Structures are given as C-alpha cells and as structure tokens.
C-alpha cells in the first residue's frame, strides 16, 4: 500500500510538471503571449514643462474656474450701474368732453338756456432724467411741455387758445441718517470688488492644484515605466534560471522540484509584468485627462513617454523661510482677508440700518404760458413764474427688529471671518511643516533603499554562485531574485516620492508657477 501510494504521488507530480512545462513552454501560450508583437501604437514624448503648459491652456477645471472669475467682474459692473442715469419720455393725448352747468370765464351769457359742452384737448410730453447719487440721495430733472385747446364757442374765455405751457422742475432727495454717506452707498460695490479679488485667488488656487496634480501624475507615469523594467528584468532572470534548471534536469544533475519552482516563479512574474504594463496605461490615461485632449484623441491608444527624470539631489530647505513664503503667497490668505473685509463692510452697513429714516426733500421749478411753443419756452425760462419747496421726512419702524437681527447676524459673520483667517494661517503652517518633513524623509528613503538594493544584488550574486557549486537551491535563488526586485521597486518608489514631495512642498508654498517661470495675468 505504501509503495503504491508513493508511485501514485510520483505520477501526479510528473503530470503536474508536464502540464506546467507545456503552459510555460516558449513556443506555447504564455511564451506566445509575452513574445507576441503588439499592434503598433502612436507614441508621444512629453516633458513635465509641456504637460504643465498644456494643462494651463486646456484643463477643464481651470477653464471653469476662469469663467467664474470673469463672472465676478460683471458683479462689480452691476453694482456700479445702480448709479447710472435713467432717461425716460412719456407722450400723451387727452380729450375731455363735459357738460357745463355754469358760465366759463364769461364765455356765455348770464342766463343759460341749455347745456353747454366743454371740449378740451391736450397733448403733452414729459422728459425725465434721474440718477442716484453717491451720497445716497437722488436727483430728478423733469421737463413737461403741453398744448391745450378748447372748443371755439368757449374760446373767448381764455387768453390763448390753443395755449402752450411748459414746466421745468428739479427735485432732490437726500437721506440724512439711514443710507446716508458715500461709504454706506458704495458698500456693495466694495463687496463686489472683494468678491472679484477672492475669485481671482480661487482661480489661482485651482491652477496651483491642477499643476500639482499634473506633476504628481507625471511622476507616477515615470514610476510605472521604470517599475515595468524592474518586472521585466525579474521575469528575464527567472526565465534564465528556468532554462538553466531544465538543462541540468535533463542532464540528471538537478531534481524536478527545482524545475517546477522556477516555472512557478516565471508564471508569477509574467503576471507582475502584465500588472505593471496595465499600471502604465492607467497612469497615462490619467495624465492625458488632465491635459484635456479632444474626445477623439482620448479614445485612441496613445502612449506617453516622459522625458524628465526624477531628481535625486537634496534641495536646501529652511522651514521658517518656507512658512513665510507660504503665508505671503498662498491664495487662501488673500481670500480670508478679503472675506473679513467684506464682513466688516456688511457689518457697518447693517449698523447704519439701525438709524431712523430722515430724508431732506427739496424741489424748485419754473413755469411758462404762451400762444405758441416758442413763446411758452421764453416765458418758462424768464424766471417770472416759479415754485420751490423743502421738507423733511422721518420714519422709524417700532422695535426695528429686522435691522437689529441683521446687525447681530453680520457681527457673528465678521467674527467667523476673523477666526477663519487665523485657522487658515494655522493650517498653512502645519501643512508646510508636514511637507518639509516629507521631503526630508523621502530623501533619506532614497539613501536607505539604495543601500538595500546594493545589498540585495550582492546577496543574489552570492547565492547564484552557491547554486552553481551545489550549495544552494532554486528556492533560495528565487527568493533573492524577488528580494532584489522588491528593493529596486522600493528605490524607485522612494525616488518618485521624493520628487512628488518637492511638488507638494511647492504647492504648499504656492510657488508651483515659479518652477516654470509662469505668471497668471
């Protein structure tokens, strides 16, 4: 029974070896897939600077933010337009036909024997110009000439028939308490200007974010390409070991188990190559999306070859200097300051609304009457006929709860805006400190991972020499090959992470544009 079980186990092992050998045979499926020529794809080279410029020109997030920024300029014009003068003109024709029960200015005899008809026709034009003043008041200039005629049997009772009249009037209304003063009147213009400045820095912040994302993605493309080379080198080393083991097994100086171990390693590393190649394509698509090509181009298979190589030199960094630069240049600081200014303006306006409404109203006018239009104008401008008046209007809502509630609300908003500025400064300081530590740590990782890679190379070389003289096994060699590939990948990751950390630090200092000598207009 034990002998039969041993024979069965040997045959199962042999069958498994044959099947694995067929699958991994260079002339069959796995070897065929790896060695098969892929369809020709369009390849493009791209530098980091080119990627940044293309993103500035075409990125959708930047375009959306740019349009929003421009719309804030329109808000300023809308507020300023409230002080534009308004011209209006009104023309009318009226006819009145009424019965009379009495004489009209001696036009009829002392005794009325029947109803007398009063037929009056008038044509008038009113020209009006009005504008709001920066002091909070309003001025209105009105000119209203008219022509009036009555039926002939009554014409004797009038000096002129038809008669021409003209009225020229100037009216001024000026608040003295609520809504009085240039500062109060221009509150919403200043708020709109602050909002426009805020949106400009929101746009700048969006640009910096997109450029930082482009940089991060670009370095991930670099890592993916280099990582594929590591995976291919590991696969090649496993294939060479498999070929050597097969030759030794055929010569009878190596066991079948060593061949199986090498074949399993090849299969595993084929999978790693496939995954690494997919990672490249994924990162390339992410980078292309950030550059916003046309949809037709995005549908096509385009391979991007990065031209820039990651730096491995340590840049001198002063933590306090980095914090000062960030405080000076970060868009969020300007946004918080302008929001605080707008809150103060709104608070002052709300405080003004607590006052009673006291307005001065003054008017003066000239009148004229003539037999024709020219005569009417001359008499109108002669100054012989005039009117004027002045007065004060006072109103105050009892309790004034709405104004007091608004004022309290604006005070709270102002306190929140002030606290937000303090919070933003704290966040920037903490963010810069973390970014500086990350740069320093990642640079040290480069040194340590490089040392680990060198040691892994030496260990693999020594283990291969031991295998040649029969002092080691395939499993140990494969383990050291795997350790070397891992060490190489770790060094690549540390190098790319260091460059991403430099990008992150520039983003925290808001100096990303300076890296490319770019300025936003």
Locate the predicted segments by residue.
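N-terminal secretory signal peptides that target proteins for export/translocation
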Residues: 1-11
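Acidic, low-complexity, intrinsically disordered peripheral segments
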Residues: 9-13, 30-40, 95-97, 285-298, ...
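Bacterial N-terminal signal peptides
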Residues: 15-26
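Bacterial Sec-pathway N-terminal export signals of envelope proteins
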Residues: 31-122, 172-187, 191-193, 218, ...
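Small/polar, glycine/serine/threonine/aspartate-rich low-complexity segments that form flexible
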Residues: 37-43, 90-170, 305-316, 348, ...
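Sec/SRP-type N-terminal targeting helices
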Residues: 63-67, 80-81, 134-165, 177-201, ...
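Amphipathic alpha-helical coiled-coil segments
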Residues: 64-79, 206-230, 240, 247, ...
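Hydrophobic, small-residue-rich alpha-helical packing segments that form membrane-like cores
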Residues: 164, 168, 176-177, 181-271, ...
